[in-house]
Design a protein with these regions (language model features):
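A short, conserved structural fragment
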Residues: 61-72
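Short acidic, hydrophobic short linear motifs in intrinsically disordered regions
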Residues: 28-44
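Short, solvent-exposed loop/turn segments that connect beta-strands within catalytic domains
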Residues: 73-77
Length: 94
């Protein structure tokens, strides 16, 4: 996954990360309002501790696609994100 100079690739990468994380959560029978973006990053072959992931995570939050759920944690102890209505719309984009 790489950002393109025009920035369109960055949005696409963030959307792909959100979609993969959401689909993983649904397939696992988990709460469909929550997404583990770190696990989604690993599914995409991305380092969940890397700078690229951190930038995509910030992008997802700034765009309002997901927000931190301070009462839930993922397997690594990080905050799980709650997907928003805007995020669900992004996941549903073709």
């Amino acid at each position: 996954m790489r950002a393109e100079a025009a920035g369109g690739g960055f949005r696409d990468d963030a959307r792909r990360l959100l979609r993969v994380s959401y689909e993983r959560q649904v397939a696992g029978g988990g709460r469909v309002t929550h997404v583990d973006l770190g696990a989604g990053a690993e599914d995409l072959g991305m380092d969940a501790a890397g700078h690229r992931f951190a930038a995509l995570l910030d992008y997802v939050e700034v765009m309002g696609w997901a927000e931190k759920d301070l009462f839930a944690q993922d397997a690594s102890g990080g905050a799980v994100r709650r997907i928003t209505a805007r995020g669900l719309a992004v996941v549903g984009e073709a």
